[in-house]
Regions:
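N-terminal membrane-anchoring/stem segments of glycan-assembly enzymes
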Residues: 1-45, 376-387, 433, 437-449
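Short hydrophobic helices that act as membrane-entry/anchoring signals
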Residues: 19-22, 26, 180-187, 191, ...
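Membrane-embedded multi-pass helical conduit in multi-pass membrane proteins
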Residues: 37-45, 309-391
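Non-transmembrane catalytic domains and loops of membrane-associated enzymes and transporters
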Residues: 38-296, 426, 432-444, 448
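Membrane-interface alpha-helices
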Residues: 41, 84, 385-409
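Short juxtamembrane and helix-loop transition motifs at transmembrane-helix boundaries
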Residues: 296-305, 329-331
Length: 449
């Protein structure tokens, strides 16, 4: 039985060494760098690019959607802004009507109603194909934006080498429970450590869906690949943000992180919902890591360390924990070396995070160690064994409207709102100061049968 103790100790020691190198290097590269902003003389001028905000919506809570749209409508942006709200076959459309009607006099808003649920990816594409802005900002329907998010992201995207950029995510419902507080800390780490370090080399590996901006010219060149993603010969319908980011990097574009562009999103408030989300994300990460491996030779060596740290680290920890538990069960001997190293790493890690964030609340992140070991590690193992499963896992069981092939586009012409008929005519609206564009027909939107 000494073999189990040896395996556990060696594995946890290797894990500690890898974590020290990986997290230490990450902390160095995650330090804020100075990025020059657009000069003040450009503000209010015609040099600001046009931006299309696309908001896919499926069975969203009306109050949550209203908050999202209000935050977009009040963006402090000097350029043309147009908003496309895509209802992806929601079963609660009647409850959303008052939310839509609040913007019937705003010429920047267009509402697209798909005949059936086709998934977030195709809902995005429906709006992308009929919009024309220089940049596309994808926003989740449960997310609210700080007033300068569009401006901050656009400033960073002025470099033509940048294909995508994401903002900093926080939990809008952070104070609801211990779990939402913990997830908010997870988001801070994911953004201000992981993404910030990757952005130092222009290679953010996942521009998160709640708030991500794309250069239209880059996006259109990748749209067919994005729409038809397959895994083991089957359509892959989730992890769209990570896959699109990898496609951007594969095409030679830079991907960035903008911490000043803050977006607040609703996070799971129950353990069951949280684990479903983590399972979906784990499958997506494993799938696209296989694609990302081919990119590593063309990226900075730090990204290789990043991939190793995120994949080999959990494996070493799992081996250490399993061997330690086996030792405890079979010999009644506690794996004290393993437990001591894990406890020490947890204390040091939380103290460093609290110091970097200047927030004592991160000392409570120690709770995450237990969740990681006893829930997330087994979940990742299950995800690895079920990679071909493309179930979204979070779709609410609400009756969907009758199936239809063509979407209905409800546009707001300047001065007078109009609702299109089911048969197809629609009116494409203009931005705040954009010249009137051509009328868009509903059959120009590609929705799945």
């Amino acid at each position: 039985m000494d073999l189990l103790a040896t395996v556990s100790t060696v594995a946890i020691s290797c894990y500690a060494l890898l974590s020290a190198v990986y997290k230490g290097t990450q902390a160095v590269y995650a330090q804020p760098s100075t990025i020059t902003s657009m000069s003040d003389d450009l503000l209010g001028s015609d040099l600001w690019p046009s931006v299309d905000v696309i908001i896919p919506c499926y069975n969203e809570n009306p109050r949550t959607l209203a908050a999202c749209l209000a935050s977009v409508a009040t963006q402090e942006y000097a350029g043309d802004l147009h908003v496309y709200v895509v209802d992806d076959g929601s079963g609660n459309r009647d409850t959303l009507v008052p939310v839509h009607h609040a913007y019937v006099d705003d010429p920047r808003f267009t509402f697209i109603q798909l005949g059936k649920n086709v998934g977030k990816r195709k809902a995005q594409i429906a709006a992308i194909r009929i919009s024309s802005g220089d940049f596309v900002l994808s926003v989740d329907s449960d997310t609210t934006l700080e007033p300068e998010v569009v401006t901050k992201l656009t400033e960073r995207m002025r470099d033509p080498a940048i294909g995508a950029a994401m903002g900093q995510l926080v939990a809008s419902n952070r104070t609801d429970s211990w779990l939402t507080r913990l997830i908010d800390m997870e988001y801070w780490l994911a953004c201000n450590e992981e993404r910030a370090a990757q952005a130092r080399f222009g290679a953010v590996m996942c521009c998160c869906g709640p708030c991500a901006m794309y250069r239209r010219s880059s996006l259109l060149s990748l749209l067919d690949q994005y729409e038809t993603q397959l895994f083991r010969g089957k359509p892959s319908d989730f992890g769209e943000d990570r896959h699109l980011t990898i496609l951007m990097l594969k095409a030679g574009f830079r991907t960035e992180y903008v911490p000043e562009a803050v977006a607040a999103t609703v996070v799971p408030d129950s353990l069951q919902a949280y684990l479903r989300q983590q399972l979906r994300w784990a499958r997506s990460t494993f799938r696209d890591t296989l694609l990302a491996l081919r990119l590593l030779p063309s990226l900075d060596r730090y990204l290789t360390l990043d991939v190793i740290g995120q994949n080999l680290g959990p494996l070493l920890l799992a081996i250490a924990v399993l061997a330690g538990l086996a030792e405890l069960v079979l010999t009644n001997n506690a794996p004290w070396p393993t437990a001591t190293i894990i406890a020490g790493m947890t204390v040091i890690r939380c103290a460093v995070i609290a110091f970097r964030a200047h927030q004592l609340r991160f000392l409570g992140f120690a709770v995450h160690t237990f969740i990681n070991i006893f829930l997330l590690l087994p979940l990742k193992g299950y995800a690895l064994c079920t990679l071909s499963n493309s179930d979204w896992l979070s779709r609410k069981s609400v009756s969907v409207p009758p199936e239809g092939k063509k979407p209905i586009i409800i546009a707001n012409p300047i001065g007078r709102p109009t609702v299109s008929s089911v048969s197809g005519e629609s009116h494409h609206t203009t931005g705040r100061s954009r010249a009137p564009s051509r009328l868009a027909r509903s059959d120009s939107v590609h929705s799945a049968d």
